[in-house]
Amino acid sequence: MASGRGASSRWFFTREQLENTPSRRCGVEADKELSCRQQAANLIQEMGQRLNVSQLTINTAIVYMHRFYMHHSFTKFNKNIISSTALFLAAKVEEQARKLEHVIKVAHACLHPLEPLLDTKCDAYLQQTQELVILETIMLQTLGFEITIEHPHTDVVKCTQLVRASKDLAQTSYFMATNSLHLTTFCLQYKPTVIACVCIHLACKWSNWEIPVSTDGKHWWEYVDPTVTLELLDELTHEFLQILEKTPNRLKKIRNWRANQAARKPKVDGQVSETPLLGSSLVQNSILVDSVTGVPTNPSFQKPSTSAFPAPVPLNSGNISVQDSHTSDNLSMLATGMPSTSYGLSSHQEWPQHQDSARTEQLYSQKQETSLSGSQYNINFQQGPSISLHSGLHHRPDKISDHSSVKQEYTHKAGSSKHHGPISTTPGIIPQKMSLDKYREKRKLETLDLDVRDHYIAAQVEQQHKQGQSQAASSSSVTSPIKMKIPIANTEKYMADKKEKSGSLKLRIPIPPTDKSASKEELKMKIKVSSSERHSSSDEGSGKSKHSSPHISRDHKEKHKEHPSSRHHTSSHKHSHSHSGSSSGGSKHSADGIPPTVLRSPVGLSSDGISSSSSSSRKRLHVNDASHNHHSKMSKSSKSSGSSSSSSSSVKQYISSHNSVFNHPLPPPPPVTYQVGYGHLSTLVKLDKKPVETNGPDANHEYSTSSQHMDYKDTFDMLDSLLSAQGMNM
């Protein structure tokens, strides 16, 4: 029970009181009394180590001993039995209780190392047992049952953390706090905060370090205890050094501490001290380790309600400010025997480690940190390119900008590596984005190829029209014997291959069917009507109307008047979008077992054995789907089709008026932009070809491509392609 702040002032004595102790009144000299106190403290230390109690328990027992002899004389109470009693009581207080039997045996072993172990049945053992129990009661009464002790070690740790002291300086200061209990009566004169400042001040002078003034203009000791002054620190430091001079045995142990530590097996930081204070805040966590001795630490630190201190810096050997030359000689003598700042008793296992090992350890830690900053940067790539790079780059922020280039280089190397495990990556998974200029160039090349094939297709269509002119009247009941695959399938397969390589859109382009019975005059009239309808649908497009404009209704009425055979136009529109990316007509053909790339007569194919009634019903469904596509696409893309006035309207005329068959082939129209919107994909595709006539004299062209539909990874890519396709004719 170490630190209960606000201890009673009855346990702080003046110098006059210390010179008038019960021992002094009994004739004991001052030096003799101090020597007895030091011997009792040494016995408590040795017993505590053998009993395996914490250093906190040992320090508490030493304070009990000092306070006890302020009310009792060494001549009446033997220091050895009082030491055992104090440790026995302190172990209980600090919750590390030891059996009375063990305490007596350990005390006997320390006092009589050459004698055999004490028998528990002998009279000496029973006598010591009775004495210890009685003395425990006397000690409790003497202490006034104030068993809570404040130690300066807590303040030493706080202050060294506050100023970000080095590990050596912190260890030296902490060790001097323990020595103050062993060698001096500071615990009877000053508060723990004052003793802590004295220990740090002495450690700084001993190791030639200086803690500079904080940014607030305050000295470091003012943050520990405002009542402390530099004069008081120098005075107590001088007194401490004089006590060390009077104890040559202790000074000899301090000088030989390094040799003893070198001979011992190096201990882990967590095993150096058994003190809970050290284990939690100093040794195990290595909080105070900031730099190697002589190297300035972090120039500032921040604490709540405190300001920043620059790091302690080494002093020159001639700048040690002491009161007289005698103290300077003591410092030089101690520094000669202990040139480093880590020193201590041979019996103390609580603290310091070897100076060289500590310095080597810190150098190694700094070197390891430097190497990690470069090695982790490369290790992350050895584990695979999918690992986040920022976890290895926190030491090297200047390398973050090189992330992309290094990663691309690594991907290239991994692809050509001999190892085909998880290290190698699969290139080409992410589709590449194309700029607008590249997209236009690619589309121009595709358009030229389509023009060449269009001439061949137009020649075949003209020949088919000449053969089928005589059979126009009986077109509804006669099946066409012609079944052929036109090269347009190859054209669209070529387009699909080109698009698949470039990683852009993959579309299915249905060729709008044509009717043969419409005249050129009717076509011109319908083009004008559709053109005016396009402007009206542009106004209504923002509302996404699902119904056609009045112009379209008028268009349908004219077609009903001129083509009585097309009565199925009055049927209601069916919403039958195909989500597989193919057209409705293509889906119907696939259901019938006919490849969609085959152009056939709408009435039926003789090879399939399909009756004319079933063919006409299939034709009716396709017309409804096409009409629905016409209305929905017109409302969705009013502005995107505005750039191609007559061409877009002519395509819409083809879609909305299936039953009309042209008697004469049309000249190739200019490049048109018509909308393809099947399933989830709606985009604009540039067509630079004339609509293809059907094979037979009464054939209705129903066609859909078999190119694959590619899903977009995000909406941004789709919008980019839409805008690129829209700007083709601008």
UniProtKB/Swiss-Prot annotation:
<dbReference type="GO" id="GO:0003682">
    <property type="term" value="F:chromatin binding"/>
</dbReference>
<dbReference type="InterPro" id="IPR047322">
    <property type="entry name" value="CYCLIN_CCNT2_rpt2"/>
</dbReference>
<dbReference type="GO" id="GO:0007519">
    <property type="term" value="P:skeletal muscle tissue development"/>
</dbReference>
<feature type="compositionally biased region" description="Basic residues">
    <location>
        <begin position="566"/>
        <end position="578"/>
    </location>
</feature>
<keyword id="KW-0131">Cell cycle</keyword>
<dbReference type="GO" id="GO:0051147">
    <property type="term" value="P:regulation of muscle cell differentiation"/>
</dbReference>
<feature type="compositionally biased region" description="Low complexity">
    <location>
        <begin position="637"/>
        <end position="652"/>
    </location>
</feature>
<feature type="compositionally biased region" description="Low complexity">
    <location>
        <begin position="606"/>
        <end position="616"/>
    </location>
</feature>
<dbReference type="GO" id="GO:0045944">
    <property type="term" value="P:positive regulation of transcription by RNA polymerase II"/>
</dbReference>
<feature type="compositionally biased region" description="Basic and acidic residues">
    <location>
        <begin position="398"/>
        <end position="412"/>
    </location>
</feature>
<feature type="compositionally biased region" description="Basic and acidic residues">
    <location>
        <begin position="552"/>
        <end position="565"/>
    </location>
</feature>
<dbReference type="GO" id="GO:0051301">
    <property type="term" value="P:cell division"/>
</dbReference>
<feature type="domain" description="Cyclin N-terminal">
    <location>
        <begin position="12"/>
        <end position="147"/>
    </location>
</feature>
<dbReference type="InterPro" id="IPR047321">
    <property type="entry name" value="CYCLIN_CCNT2_rpt1"/>
</dbReference>
<keyword id="KW-0804">Transcription</keyword>
<dbReference type="GO" id="GO:0061575">
    <property type="term" value="F:cyclin-dependent protein serine/threonine kinase activator activity"/>
</dbReference>
<comment type="function">
    <text>(Microbial infection) Promotes transcriptional activation of early and late herpes simplex virus 1/HHV-1 promoters.</text>
</comment>
<dbReference type="GO" id="GO:0019086">
    <property type="term" value="P:late viral transcription"/>
</dbReference>
<feature type="modified residue" description="Phosphoserine">
    <location>
        <position position="601"/>
    </location>
</feature>
<dbReference type="GO" id="GO:0006366">
    <property type="term" value="P:transcription by RNA polymerase II"/>
</dbReference>
<dbReference type="GO" id="GO:0043923">
    <property type="term" value="P:positive regulation by host of viral transcription"/>
</dbReference>
<comment type="similarity">
    <text>Belongs to the cyclin family. Cyclin C subfamily.</text>
</comment>
<dbReference type="GO" id="GO:0005634">
    <property type="term" value="C:nucleus"/>
</dbReference>
<feature type="compositionally biased region" description="Polar residues">
    <location>
        <begin position="341"/>
        <end position="350"/>
    </location>
</feature>
<comment type="subunit">
    <text>(Microbial infection) Interacts with HIV-2 and SIV Tat. Does not bind efficiently to the transactivation domain of the HIV-1 Tat.</text>
</comment>
<dbReference type="GO" id="GO:0001223">
    <property type="term" value="F:transcription coactivator binding"/>
</dbReference>
<keyword id="KW-0945">Host-virus interaction</keyword>
<dbReference type="InterPro" id="IPR006671">
    <property type="entry name" value="Cyclin_N"/>
</dbReference>
<dbReference type="GO" id="GO:0019901">
    <property type="term" value="F:protein kinase binding"/>
</dbReference>
<dbReference type="GO" id="GO:0008024">
    <property type="term" value="C:cyclin/CDK positive transcription elongation factor complex"/>
</dbReference>
<comment type="subunit">
    <text>Interacts with CDK9 to form P-TEFb. Interacts with POLR2A (via the C-terminal domain (CTD)); mediates transcriptional activity. Interacts with HEXIM1; mediates formation of a tripartite complex with KPNA2. Interacts with HEXIM2. Interacts with PKN1; enhances MYOD1-dependent transcription. P-TEFB complex interacts with RB1; promotes phosphorylation of RB1. P-TEFB complex interacts with MYOD1; promotes the transcriptional activity of MYOD1 through its CDK9-mediated phosphorylation. Interacts with MDFI and MDFIC.</text>
</comment>
<dbReference type="InterPro" id="IPR013763">
    <property type="entry name" value="Cyclin-like_dom"/>
</dbReference>
<keyword id="KW-0597">Phosphoprotein</keyword>
<dbReference type="GO" id="GO:0000079">
    <property type="term" value="P:regulation of cyclin-dependent protein serine/threonine kinase activity"/>
</dbReference>
<keyword id="KW-0832">Ubl conjugation</keyword>
<feature type="compositionally biased region" description="Polar residues">
    <location>
        <begin position="360"/>
        <end position="389"/>
    </location>
</feature>
<protein>
    <recommendedName>
        <fullName>Cyclin-T2</fullName>
    </recommendedName>
</protein>
<dbReference type="GO" id="GO:0097322">
    <property type="term" value="F:7SK snRNA binding"/>
</dbReference>
<dbReference type="Pfam" id="PF21797">
    <property type="entry name" value="CycT2-like_C"/>
</dbReference>
<dbReference type="GO" id="GO:0032968">
    <property type="term" value="P:positive regulation of transcription elongation by RNA polymerase II"/>
</dbReference>
<dbReference type="GO" id="GO:0048471">
    <property type="term" value="C:perinuclear region of cytoplasm"/>
</dbReference>
<keyword id="KW-0539">Nucleus</keyword>
